[in-house]
Amino acid sequence: MAAPAKRARVSGGSPLVAPCPSPRAARAPLPLPAGSSGGEPEGDAVAGFLRWCRRVGLELSPKVTVSRQGTVAGYGMVARESVRAGELLFAVPRSALLSPHTCSISGLLERERGALQSLSGWVPLLLALLHELQAPASPWSPYFALWPELGRLEHPMFWPEEERLRLLKGTGVPEAVEKDLVNIRSEYYSIVLPFMEAHSDLFSPSVRSLELYQQLVALVMAYSFQEPLEEDDDEKEPNSPLMVPAADILNHIANHNANLEYSADYLRMVATQPILEGHEIFNTYGQMANWQLIHMYGFAEPYPNNTDDTADIQMVTVRDAALQGTKDETEKLLVCERWDFLCKQEMVGEEGAFVIGCEEVLTEEELATTLKVLCMPAEEFRDYKERAGWGEEETEDDSLAITDIPKLQESWKRLLRNSVLLTLQTYTTDLKTDQDLLSNKEAYATLSWREQQALQVRYGQKMILHRVLELTN
């Protein structure tokens, strides 16, 4: 799938509107396969899935096996023999993919395509899943047997609100989840439920449930793939998500050793580096911060493993820090005027965030321009505003790498520092509290899964923010 952007510079609306995550996520270790909770034992579920693979032409290399042994979480794929870089691990024929185009109600979904349009773009796939899940003779039943138990998904959207706020306040996750829940409910009652009721012969009462729909949204968010557009198709809408059996079994680490390749007839998983016998095969889904991982997949990478981790400074926080530094009402009005100017230039927004990574500022132009405009002398701002701030001579000065922070003007550094301090106040714990928990193995072991994952998210963000503080001294 196409890798998601690290963060839009001016964000608004639900994360569900964004493209699906790219190649699949690791899941939390708690969920068991759906088949294991009913009648089919776990070993039979794997054997049934492998028989299904042979039947549908899904070619697994004899060098790999599906297993729960030797994996970081749940089911995974392990090398039975050493694998060379470039070797084919498995190939999935397009006929085995589960999508609105391959499901048993594909004709109906195509005819009703206009009525099924939504912000997420996921409704046709979700309806396909709802229909196939209830069908005893669904061609994908052996594939479903390896799914995690839907009632035990660990996404924060399934946490009690109090727990979500207590553990993740300040990280950006609670706000993203609230938008998700609002959009899911709206999508279900305005589009999905009316469609199922209009075709009650195809959707039994057992699947007409907001709870089940929310669980499937989480599963699609974590397990689906999105085929990238061709280079010359950038103007087109993103491709719809689809389910890729076998590919979604792979777990994730940043230093992955496999990659999914798309062709006309097959989707192929290929080793990107040598894999030793007994080692797990990992996919990746792009550069994602820990807050994105826990939001979309229910897990976070332990510090400092996630080299793609980021911390956000809300854009309005920088405005608030600038307002706090004013001495009178006149200065406050000047700050507001400059903020309005930045909004009109689409440099900032009420729901946007400046994104700072481990080694770079990912929104360098936006942050540099904002600091400059909010800190420049009044006369200079008037000239800048008249030129609309976009003179060619300005562009070279608007880059901002982490290593450049100590070289900034003192007024810029002061505003950035105050913005970071305000951001740190939004968390429920301070850095030392989190640090003490992480360094105490016994105390860490007593934490629940959710507490451990939330701690990793908070700590990684705070370490980035504290580094910025040090650089502004």
UniProtKB/Swiss-Prot annotation:
InterPro entries: N-lys_methylase_SETD6, Rubisco_LSMT_subst-bd, Rubisco_LSMT_subst-bd_sf, SET_dom, SET_dom_sf, SETD3_SETD6_MTase, SETD6_SET. GO terms for cellular component: cytosol; nucleoplasm; nucleus. Its EC number is 2.1.1.-. Automethylated. The modification Phosphoserine is found at S14, S22. Keywords: Methylation, Methyltransferase, Nucleus, Phosphoprotein, S-adenosyl-L-methionine, Transferase. Residues 1-23 are annotated as: Disordered. It is found in: Nucleus. Belongs to the class V-like SAM-binding methyltransferase superfamily. Histone-lysine methyltransferase family. SETD6 subfamily. Protein-lysine N-methyltransferase. Monomethylates 'Lys-310' of the RELA subunit of NF-kappa-B complex, leading to down-regulation of NF-kappa-B transcription factor activity. Monomethylates 'Lys-8' of H2AZ (H2AZK8me1). Required for the maintenance of embryonic stem cell self-renewal. Methylates PAK4. This is N-lysine methyltransferase SETD6. It comes from Mus musculus (Mouse). The gene is Setd6.
